[in-house]
Amino acid sequence: MMLSASSPVRHLKATPLRPCSGRLSSAGRDPAGGESLLRVSHIFERYTMTTFRSGIALTAALMLAALTGCGASNTASSSPSTSASSSVSAVSSSVASSQAWKDLVSATGVEITYSADGSRVLTDNSGQKVELPATVDRIANLWDANNQVMLLLGSSNHIVATTQQISKMPWYKKVQPKITQASTPVSGTDLNVEELLKAKPDVVVSIDKTQVEKARAAGLTTVQLGFQDFAGLKKNVVMTAEVLGTDQARSQAIKYITYLEKNLKFVIERTASLSDDQRPKVLHIAGGSDVTKVDGSDSIIGEWMKATGAKNSIDGVANYKNISLEQIIASAPDAIIVGNSDAQQGIDSIKADAAWKDIPAVKNDKLYRNPVGTFKWDRYSTEEALHLLWAGKTLHPELFTDVDLVKETREFYSTFYGYNLTEDEAQRILAGQNPAS
């Protein structure tokens, strides 16, 4: 049974504060109606959101906007629903001028100024002030992960140039088949400027400094983005919404960040009482093709491990770092998670290699495939919001028995991508498997 945000607070053991559970209508409103100001103010007290790396509190205006769509049901339960479909109602027109959006822009540290004609000046991650056109119809998204952000913000159909990796990602193609029609001027980090120009983009997005310089030298409006932690993820979503410049994108950004914040809060509270000995040491391997390339504590991987009641077994190392097998053995991980769509290859090679056999995770068969959806859940992904729930339930199943990962995944895809996953499709994503067809 689902518990709505309007339900009375129940003091149950290890039960988190809950988001609203009302489904949004096509207009972005809960059909059940709105909340009284008094009720909303109480809800806000329960759900004040913080950006955990920066320590910036999101303001009451954002929270009130997020709760506008919650129904008035008083059904209570100890189930920890954090349904994506219930995170926030659609913000009214002219979102850019709304207090909720202004507060979110401020909280995430985004620098943006607006002109009367609808054009905008955005300060990108390189510190460059980029003047963006009032209307952005054609986008060259040269950063793999940010293609997923544009999918979430409702603008993936405007991507006219992308990367070879994204054009081949099975779940992205399943959700947005049009991505296969986009040109692919980027292979690895190499940019073919001539091919990029043929796509005639209004705006180019990239994480790579050299690509940005080449695109700007070719006379293209170019924005450099990127992030390494949850605070950066939220900032990146807001910046991308401003690149797109639509109310739909800004509304989706508010909705998504509200959902992400609630899931962060939920898993942290659910695992808060664990002692240090109860927090497993986890080794995260970037992909199955190279089992000594790991993601250490100084990364978003280390951040979600900490949030979900675990410790990264490789301390003081960033992501995608090659270390020795001896270092891995010495770190004695209690669990091993392998990322990427080739995760099973890595798990099989670990099990077949006698050098790994005395590692606690291997002896106790605690080897897991990371989920992979429209992008890898473990890094640079908007599906990090789901990954928090998966990691919590995987590493501490006894604490998360009431989390239905299939249901959460299906609702996330429906709410943020407009795609209705079947139960089998959701299970395949959670297992790190490609679509059946």
Where do the language-model regions lie?
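Short helix-initiation/N-cap motifs at beta->coil->alpha
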Residues: N125-G127, A182-E194, V317-L325
